Amino acid sequence: NRRRPVFDATLWYWKLSLSSLIISMIIWLFNLFESNYILSIVFAFGFLYSLLQGMVYKIIPFLSWFHLSSKGYFKLPTIREFIDEKYIKIHFFVHLISIVFFILSYFENNLIYSASILFLISNILFFINCLNAVKKYIAITKTAPMDLSAFK
């Protein structure tokens, strides 16, 4: 009767965040680099920003579902359907690659431009994913809560 764990891309953000926190603590504790550039990137973008994005990807769908459910709507997408998992994965990999490029730009200065563009693309994807969830919420609120035509 043991169920397999359900895959959740938002947990990747949490894992990246906690890994980055540990790595940044090691960098800080042992003063591994003469500059604090890598420490700043790993802590700010790897830990804080990844944590924030992972939380937002959980909060927006839950609040959308909760508010619609409390208003009496019957035909609702599940919490996992408010933001398509495949777009969360794409965003995660672009975000991760941008962090890697920021770190590599410490050693090769010209990579800072690629890192910045990737980070910008990552944020645009994040905005689009959140906006799509809001659009689904608005589309559902324009219907009648007691509309049971989908159950015929």
Q: PLM ranges: what are they?
A:
Residues 1-152:
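Hydrophobic alpha-helical transmembrane segments of multi-pass integral membrane proteins
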